[in-house]
């Protein structure tokens, strides 16, 4: 078995959700799924994001389209924060020359 892959069936059972929900997230591009002999597996690296999405959907009652928007905005925010850090470091470099 692959230690970096979690069976979608096991994830769904432990979170009491339908496997079709995982399929919907995959079809919308929110998560990646690896298929081994037709069985879906979720990469362990995506487990945190998948659990966050499950909470948004079931606990906060946000639909898949809303989750897509939130995930997109979070990625943009993270990208902007990284860019801001690069610019701050560059500014520090110029300020230290004086």
Write out the residue ranges for each language-model feature.
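Arg/Lys-rich, alpha-helical DNA-contact motif
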Residues: 2, 28, 32, 39, ...
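Polyanion-binding surface elements
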Residues: 1-21
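Major-groove DNA-recognition helix of helix-turn-helix-type DNA-binding domains
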Residues: 19-35
């Amino acid at each position: 078995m692959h230690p970096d892959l979690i069976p979608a069936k096991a994830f769904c059972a432990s979170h009491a959700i339908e496997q079709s929900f995982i399929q919907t997230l995959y079809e919308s591009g929110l998560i990646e799924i690896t298929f081994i002999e037709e069985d879906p597996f979720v990469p362990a690296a995506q487990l945190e994001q998948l659990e966050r999405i499950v909470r948004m959907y079931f606990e906060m009652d946000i639909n898949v389209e809303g989750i897509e928007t939130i995930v997109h905005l979070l990625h943009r925010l993270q990208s902007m924060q990284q860019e801001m850090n690069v610019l701050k470091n560059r500014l520090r470099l110029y300020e230290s020359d004086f």
